[in-house]
Regions:
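…primarily DNA-binding HTH/wHTH and HhH modules…
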Residues: 134-161
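Short clusters of hydrophobic/aromatic residues that line enzyme substrate/ligand-binding pockets
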Residues: 66-70, 113, 138-141
Length: 161
């Protein structure tokens, strides 16, 4: 594994690559669930150029979807949730309960969906920021609620970046 660090309007982003060149992690500074940096291998800011380019386009309002190879390291349930997150359209939100229903889970599974959502290792590209509480309120986000709000505002065209 190797990693790169790129600047963004949200601060530095750490991009983690597998040896096969897949994106395995995208973490913001002070990310709540970021593994220790030493687990990412050596720093090489030339890895994952397509990811960095697409993120720059996203922040410049030129991209609404990503097309980069992803590597999910998690339980089968977490991977199911993370895959479903990619179907939430740009600029829209859904609730944990609605996401649980879309996955065909039993009533009350929204908490499990929320826990899996919170462990998403590939922020922004796997848009866990688009999931909100049942009342529309902002709830947990690994990069912090301020960044979650900034991403939602950005996608609605209300942001400064």
């Amino acid at each position: 594994m190797t990693y790169a660090v790129m600047d963004s309007p949200l601060g530095p982003l750490t991009l983690v690559a597998t040896d096969a060149g897949e994106l395995a992690g995208l973490y913001m500074a002070e990310h709540r669930h970021r593994p220790p940096m030493e687990t990412f291998g050596d720093r090489d800011d030339s890895v994952l150029p397509a990811v960095a380019e697409q993120l720059t386009e996203y922040f410049d309002h030129g991209r609404t979807a990503f097309d980069v190879p992803l590597h999910f390291a998690g339980t089968p349930f977490q991977q199911q949730v993370w895959t479903a997150l990619q179907d939430i359209p740009y600029g829209e939100t859904t609730t944990y309960g609605d996401l649980a229903r879309e996955l065909g889970l039993v009533p009350g599974a929204s908490r499990a969906v929320g826990l899996a959502n919170g462990k998403n290792p590939i922020s922004i590209i796997v848009p866990c920021h688009r999931v909100v509480g049942s009342t529309g309120s902002l709830t947990g986000y690994g990069g912090g609620l301020e960044r979650k709000q900034a991403l939602l505002d950005h996608e609605r065209g209300d942001a400064l970046f």
